[in-house]
Amino acid sequence: MTNPAAPPCAGAGHASLTAAQAGVTAERAVAQLLSGPPAARAEQVAGRLLAIQGQDPRGARLAVRVRSQGLSAADVDHALTVDRSLVISWLNRGTLHLVRSADYWPLHRLTTPQLETGCARRLGQEGIPPAAADRAAGLIERFLDRDGPLTRAQLAERLESAGVRTQGQALVFLTFLASLRGISVRGPMIGKQHAYVLARDWLGAPPAAPDRDTALAWLARRYLAGHAPATERDLAKWAGLPLRDARRGLRAIAPELDEGQDGLVRLAREPDGTARAAGPEPALPLPRLLGVFDPLLHGWQSRAAVLGPHEPEIVRGGMFGSFALVGGRAVGTWSLPGGQVSLTLLEEVSPAHRRALETDAEDVRRFLALAKPATR
């Protein structure tokens, strides 16, 4: 599994975390379900993290794997297609996210309105003026109402037949616009694709909207459940909201918070509302293999404590690669050529940690239902 062509210490090395960094990393690992009791269902993972980046389907599923026990990628597909308990849509920061269906409408209302201006600009660059974009959004709604679920190709075919240009990036931003307007979400799997469906049909009518203070309080509380300890700037960056909104949400739940000497805030009670039990400090997570765009790299302003000097090997051109985590730090990268896990270590790890990563590699293959290599 380990790449024999790569030196075991390809980088300059990643200095051990300071005691303070280790404490914060361990707390966040518990919040992220990377330490402590694993989730039993995909919906529990999505509920704890609130939103999992979903532009890479395999990466989103691997984020569920590493935070749960005994699940498979097929279980995530079942939640998307049969149970309708999970959906994928453009939300925070204008990025596709996997979320619980119950959390879709609150997140949509909070994080998407400010994205329409940028979407209109990009559509204009694709030669689609506002009136044509409005018409296309209406057509998408009509086609999904009549024929949905529809794959990307099926939707493009219908739009083209109606005289709507879909070449270049036009289709991407037209479906983005329909999502921002609450018309469509990506729900069921058709083959290996996430098909588009009408949001109101797939999820039901949107519930009554709370006032903004209540909504921002909900967001702050849910964010901290999966990301504490954190700062107001961490929340603002993760949600793609102005800092003033993050502050407003945190102020609304101030009686529920503990602020440490490090300036980081935490929920005073467990995410389920029970009192925090006194006990030893949480331990750093066990060695694991994390997939592309893993939430551990997207929940806070800084990724330095996790990636250290290895960031150039893991983050390239805005793409966040798969990486190996040991002691709360990235120590290598990994890939799946031919369905086999290939691990490239960027620094030395102990034999025990290497064996743990190899064991986790087998679980990756189990989760993805990859065929075992043929024996000779």
Question: Where do the PLM segments sit?
Answer:
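Phosphate-backbone binding and catalysis cores of DNA-processing enzymes
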Residues: 1-153, 157-167
